[in-house]
């Protein structure tokens, strides 16, 4: 199972680079529709797509861990999409298998990246029985 995070944005502060590894940089000076073309091209073939949007479905860390276990067992690769300042183009949301939100708050996309990576790590530690996550 591979997890891919596709995100748009300007050069991130150093703390973002410390928390994440940039897989592919997408230029931020494009319109929403042009961003959608670039984002769609960055999605690995056959990958299930989860769009992150402030109006998406709430998730819990435990639910994420359960979902990761299911995807791993089924052999699915997953791509998480994080939009720029204007969010994601509607075409990306309609083609996504799910739309999730990380918070009821509106988050800057740099913070959303870090939060997503931390939650993926936390969910993974739950599956491994590691004591990082505490109820």
From Swiss-Prot:
Q: Which domain of life is it from?
A: Bacteria
Could you state one GO cellular component term attached to this entry? cytoplasm
Pfam families in UniProt: SPOUT_MTase
Q: What is its main location?
A: cytoplasm
The molecular function terms in GO held by this entry are:
rRNA (pseudouridine-N3-)-methyltransferase activity
Q: Could you tell me which NCBIfam families the record lists for this protein? A: PRK00103.1-4 (NF000986)
**Family named by the database record:** Belongs to the RNA methyltransferase RlmH family.
Assembly mode: Homodimer.
Listed name of the protein: Ribosomal RNA large subunit methyltransferase H
Gene source species: Polynucleobacter necessarius subsp. necessarius (strain STIR1)
């Amino acid at each position: 199972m591979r997890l891919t995070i596709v995100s748009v944005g300007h050069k991130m502060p150093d703390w973002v680079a410390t928390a994440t590894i940039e897989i592919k940089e997408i230029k931020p000076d494009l319109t929403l529709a042009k961003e959608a073309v670039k984002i769609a091209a960055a999605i690995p073939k056959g990958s299930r797509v989860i769009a992150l949007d402030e109006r998406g479905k709430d998730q819990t860390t435990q639910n994420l861990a359960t979902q990761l276990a299911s995807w791993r067992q089924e052999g699915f690769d997953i791509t998480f999409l994080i939009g720029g300042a204007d969010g994601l183009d509607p075409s990306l949301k309609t083609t996504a298998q799910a739309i999730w939100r990380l918070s009821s708050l509106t988050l800057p996309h740099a913070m959303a990246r870090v939060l997503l990576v931390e939650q993926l790590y936390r969910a993974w530690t739950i599956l491994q029985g590691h004591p990082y996550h505490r109820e």
